[in-house]
Amino acid sequence: MELPQMPELMGLSLLVGLLALVATAAVARGWLRAEEKPSQPVCQKENEPKKSGSKKQKQNQRVRKEKPQQHSFTHPLLAAALKSHSGNISCMDFSSNGKYLATCADDRTVRIWSTKDFLQREHRSMRANVELDHATLVRFSPDCRAFIVWLANGDTLRVFKMTKREDGGFTFTATPEDFPKKHKAPIINIGIADTGKFIMTASSDTTVLIWNLKGQVLSTINTNQMNNSHAVISPCSRFVGSCGFTPDVKVWEVCFGKKGEFQEVLRAFELKGHSASVHSFAFSNDSRRMASVSKDGTWKLWDTDVEYKKQQDPYLLRTGRFEEASTMPCRLALSPDTHVLALATGTNIHLFNTRRGEKEEYFECVHGECIADLTFDITGRFLASCGDRAVRLFHNTPGHRAVVEEMQSLLKRASSESTRQRLQQQLTQAQEALKSLGALKK
């Protein structure tokens, strides 16, 4: 066998070595270029400036990105949205003088808003801190110089005094001692009588407690309703009512002597007519009317201006259908003049004309969470709701329409010129309010 000649083998070896050297040089040159010009991150565009900052700042940026977005809601009748809380709002209360709105949230603050700013572009609030706890319920004192809250973790009442400053704001100071713990079940509502004589607290079992302002229990009411779903003090301060699993609303009178001393709590009357458990109820501003909503899918308006001591029962004035109440919990608010009934289920609000029993307005997906509280201001001009980190205020157009209907009816029967002038003035004011909101029916 012949072997290859030596010159040919040497030439082939030199060619292979030269090719390997060229390839190595090309790879090394590519690495050098990569080091001179680092590649852009995938999430960063070519022209985007490089982000700088410390590790702590980057962590804070990540936290802000994870913060839930504020729920967006718009409607022609939305008057304002109050946004200062960083946590979900659970309760609201208008002061008796109509100047302030108190809100509490799980961000450990209570905020006091000025009602005169509602229609302004900016809504300022004053903050009261709830130390080492947060409030779930809040109520103004009758003189508007204090408010009480229910503490979520402490399971008791705390009183805050409001001291007016020279600049028009307030300084908030919690009293040294909270009320003693008495309830054994979760609290559903609290209240202060407009007379300032007593405080009410109600829990989800069957207990309603009547306290004096010093934190002493005056009376314990057993509602015998299997469980309580709502309880409230009447605006006249004479009555305390409750509703729950049973198909009725029970009302008691809190009796005081001529010298202001507490005497007793007596059963006054009941609202009977529903066929299932009652979700909620409310008194009118003069305590002469009441409204209730039940799991039987109806709401009812009652005349409670009766001589209950002579065994006279309240009169049923109107029954309306509300099927949503038969499948889910429902909140209720009655306008001060009883012309409008607001019902809330989930995140939606329905407004009814109580004279005709018809639904007039519907607000859908008002909040990002289920509506926690619903109330009219003391003038009946606005309806307020909360359910996330904002309070939403609506113009009460059904209330203005009800005034128009009522004044037109009364004008036909007016006998004196002075009466006609007064009624015509109220009619004109209501029509102008509707016109300004674009809600005047032609």
UniProtKB/Swiss-Prot annotation:
GO biological process: cellular response to glucose starvation; cellular response to hypoxia; endoplasmic reticulum unfolded protein response
Cross-link Glycyl lysine isopeptide (Lys-Gly) (interchain with G-Cter in SUMO2), where in sequence: 164
GO (cellular component) term, any one: endoplasmic reticulum
Gene3D superfamilies found in the cross-reference section: YVTN repeat-like/Quinoprotein amine dehydrogenase
GO molecular function: phosphoprotein binding; protein kinase binding; translation initiation factor binding
Pfam families in the record: WD40
The keyword Ribosomal protein appears for this protein: no
Compositionally biased intervals (Basic residues): 52-65
Protein name as catalogued: Transducin beta-like protein 2
Disulphide linkage map: none
Residues bearing the modification Phosphothreonine: 428
Top-level lineage group: Eukaryota
Phylogenetic classification of the source organism: Eukaryota, Metazoa, Chordata, Craniata, Vertebrata
Keyword terms of this UniProt record: Isopeptide bond, Phosphoprotein, Repeat, Ubl conjugation, WD repeat
Residue ranges of the region described as Disordered: 36-71
WD repeats: 84-123, 130-170, 182-222, 224-263, 273-312, 323-362, 366-404
